[in-house]
């Protein structure tokens, strides 16, 4: 048999023998612990349930909100005006300042040597377009007009007069064009659309109330008469006091003159074409009826 424990083991056993035994008499919560109070019956909301003694407040027969005892209430007495009438159907345009556009160009997120449209702006994280929230594109504003130095061919949906002047002063070109919600979703997210294997649809024409804006050369509308653009550019240059550059002698003249057809969504891709992402090919329709439909 083993002999009696000696050293540290013996001292540990002696210490345990002297400790009190665990029993109901010496149990207590841990230091810092909190036990939720138990709510007995009839506590806080007992007897009258907090409604008081009799009357309409206890019986729940109080008049509705806005009732004034029988007289004409305030919300009917005062006439209303439709300031917000049709607010859920109004078109919204995300602002894009010239300062922001110059910033995107300086970082290389937008290529000024190519025509700039919504596809470039969205892919460069310059703007966020949400067609489901009534976004209809981008509005070019004049903030940063004094510091804008890039020469660009940009297509937006709305543009202020000073923003147009700032771009044309540097030899650039501005075009305002309308996109219906379906075309807007496709031009902002081209890759998911191409992966579906569907033909590129025709872009719809603007509604009746927007036709005057997009047919005016002063707004650089895409439906305006091209013969009126030189006169409108010269008139704007005289108004703001700058010399209009001759873009016909510019080495980027071909890029600056590139414009989309009113029915076209992408640069270089016509309606009716199918982009095959797997084989990296473009399929074009050959049927006469399809060609007639997509060119009409």
UniProtKB/Swiss-Prot annotation:
One annotated Gene Ontology cellular component of this protein: mitochondrion
GO biological process: cellular response to leukemia inhibitory factor; mitochondrial translation
Keyword Protein biosynthesis carried by entry: no
The entry's keywords: Mitochondrion, Ribonucleoprotein, Ribosomal protein, Transit peptide
Transit peptide: 1-21
Location in or out of the cell: Mitochondrion
An example molecular function term from Gene Ontology annotations: RNA binding
Bilayer-spanning residue ranges: none
Positions with biased composition (Basic residues): 36-52
Domain of life where this protein originates: Eukaryota
Residues covered by region (Disordered): 22-66
Quaternary state and interactors: Component of the mitochondrial large ribosomal subunit (mt-LSU). Mature mammalian 55S mitochondrial ribosomes consist of a small (28S) and a large (39S) subunit. The 28S small subunit contains a 12S ribosomal RNA (12S mt-rRNA) and 30 different proteins. The 39S large subunit contains a 16S rRNA (16S mt-rRNA), a copy of mitochondrial valine transfer RNA (mt-tRNA(Val)), which plays an integral structural role, and 52 different proteins.
Matches recorded under HAMAP family: Ribosomal_uL15
Homology family: Belongs to the universal ribosomal protein uL15 family.
Designated name of the protein: Large ribosomal subunit protein uL15m
Gene name of the record: MRPL15
